[in-house]
Structure formats: structure tokens, C-alpha cells
């Protein structure tokens, strides 16, 4: 009997520098969490209750917590077919983050902190009815003025 359509653990591409070079690494987006997609939540809940000791589902207020529609839509926009948030290419233009390409496009209001040296953006997102902090990879090759950015865009 199939109770789950898909079981996955979302990840993100990050960069790590070792041996003098930057390397892409895949990291867990929500360490310790596994997501289960199912059309029959009641049947899934019953099945999971019988797996005592094997799995501890997220329970808030005594029950299993499904992801809300808007939370699910946000995650689907960020994740690719492999359930991974890929690297974004961004610029800082006159002190503001401008996303050139990648999953952060249109989501700069969620960015709380940028670490250019580690090539990481810390985001605040809504998940399980609460604000959660996540990290995603990004590349910021330069800080530019508006004129420099427009000149660069015109050249490409």
C-alpha cells in the first residue's frame, strides 16, 4: 500500500574553499527533517504512528503538521527537480541586493544577512507556522553603482 507520493530532504548548493579552490557542496536545507508528500494525510499519519522509534514526525499541538499552501508554494519556487536550492548570482547595487539569476529572484525581502566571504545568504522564511532561518548559496562578484550595473547589463 502506497501512503507516500514522495519522500525527500531539501538541500542547497553551497561553496566551500579548500586546497585553495572553491568547491560546490550540497548541504541539508533543514537538517534533521524529512518531508513526505502524500495525497492521503490521514492514512500516512496512521502508518507513521505504527513506526514508533523509527521516525519522529513534526508534531505541533499533538498532531502532524502539514505544510501550508503558501509555504509549499514558496518551497516549490526555491527548489529544483532534485529538491535542491541552487546557487544564485547576485550583485550589490548601491547597497541593495539585486538577483541576476537563481532561486533568490523575487525573494530578496527574505534575505536577512549576507556573508560574501562564505558565499551564503541567511533567509527568514515561514514554515510550520513559524519563522525559520535557512541558509542558501549565492555569488556576489561585485559591489556596483547603478551606472556600473546598467553598463554591465548593456554589455551582455
Task: Specify the residue positions occupied by each region the protein language model found.
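Short beta-strand-centered aromatic/proline hotspots
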Residues: 106-114
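Acidic-enriched and Gly/Ser
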Residues: 1-96, 113, 118, 122-156
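Short, charged beta-turn/beta-strand-edge "cap" motif at the junction between a beta-strand
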Residues: 101-105
Amino acid at each position: 500500500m502506497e501512503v507516500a507520493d514522495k519522500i525527500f530532504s531539501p538541500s542547497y548548493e553551497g561553496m566551500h574553499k579548500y586546497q585553495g579552490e572553491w568547491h560546490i557542496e550540497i548541504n541539508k536545507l533543514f537538517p534533521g527533517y524529512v518531508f513526505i508528500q502524500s495525497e492521503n494525510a490521514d492514512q500516512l499519519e496512521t502508518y507513521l504512528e505504527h513506526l514508533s522509534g523509527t521516525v519522529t514526525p513534526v508534531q505541533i499541538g499533538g498532531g502532524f503538521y502539514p505544510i501550508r499552501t503558501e509555504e509549499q508554494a514558496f518551497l516549490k519556487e526555491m527548489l529544483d527537480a532534485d529538491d535542491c536550492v541552487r546557487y544564485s548570482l547576485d550583485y550589490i547595487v548601491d547597497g541593495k541586493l539585486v538577483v541576476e539569476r537563481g532561486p533568490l529572484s523575487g525573494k530578496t525581502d527574505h534575505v536577512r544577512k549576507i556573508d560574501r566571504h562564505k558565499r551564503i545568504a541567511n533567509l527568514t522564511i515561514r514554515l510550520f507556522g513559524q519563522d525559520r532561518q535557512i541558509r542558501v548559496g549565492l555569488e556576489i562578484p561585485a559591489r556596483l553603482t547603478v551606472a556600473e550595473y546598467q553598463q554591465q547589463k548593456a554589455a551582455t
